[in-house]
Amino acid sequence: RALQWENLGVLAPFDMNKISNLGNVNPGMVAVGERDWNFGGKGSHWVPQLWGTESISWRTDKWTPDGLPSFGDIWEPNPGIDGAFMMGRTYSMMTGCGIWMHHQGKMDFWSSYKDDDTMRKNWQTITDYCISKKANLVKFWSGADPQKQGFTSDGVVVGQTWDGPIVSMMKAGEPVAYQTTDEGALAWVDGITLSAKAENIDEAYELINYSFTPEVGGMTINEIGYNSAVIGASDFYSDATKAISQAVYPGDTASKLNPWPPEPPWYADCLLYTSPSPRDWTIS
């Protein structure tokens, strides 16, 4: 959502000369900052720290997908599930639905990001379909803890979730699994920004350089369950982290991810008026 930040004026550009450990960071991810966060030609206003995915999770004691899971499994699960069973975040599970429809040949989902009219047409199709499946819904989530609670206490069987919260549950021995979808998981890169009003500038750069060491990168991932942008961080992954990474991204699936495309302001405005409200999802 870099394009949605540019006009706000709340971020300051980084002085890359002060990030002495920038060479430790995946150059392809650093390039995202130069490409998407270089506002007004003043330099990157963002540096990468973590990357992760959004895909399908499930209770292993209640359901198992037929092969790799699909974004369609929260809408038309295979094998089938009776009653309400799923959770997700509204716009991202609807994005997953669009990717699923794209792979079924029902729409060119990625063309939604080209112009207003195409976006509205595609998202109206997605919206109508998702509302028709509202009986599947147990809950919406809005952060990491609600995702965990969905599986532990709310009766969710399958969900479209982030990797981190569910991976941390897997490490704790909970009966859950997370895996990239057959269509390719949604991938994102989270980064660090500097407030335009920041006063503790030197301390901010110290923290960034500390974060960009392989050891700290690895320690961070062992605790939170995402993936590090720091080259060499995997050398400091625990055995449990390495094993789960192989289970989450089997074979060459990590090379088939779907990066979230940049969302211009008009896309966010259209999404606001096209996506269903909580009232639309209410089961009467």
Model-derived regions, located:
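Extracytoplasmic ligand-binding site segments that recognize negatively charged/polar headgroups
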Residues: 1-150
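Short, hydrophobic alpha-helical packing/hinge segments within bilobed ligand-binding/sensory domains
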Residues: 2, 147-150, 166, 204, ...
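A ligand-binding cleft/hinge motif common to bilobed small-molecule-binding domains
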Residues: 2-4, 160-175
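A bilobed periplasmic-binding-protein/Venus flytrap-type ligand-binding module shared by bacterial periplasmic
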Residues: 55-62, 101-104, 188-200, 219-223
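Periplasmic-binding protein-like
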Residues: 127-133, 172-193
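Paired acidic/hydrophobic, glycine-rich loop segments that form the ligand-binding mouth/hinge
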Residues: 140, 157-162
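Mature extracytoplasmic/periplasmic domains
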Residues: 185-186, 195-262
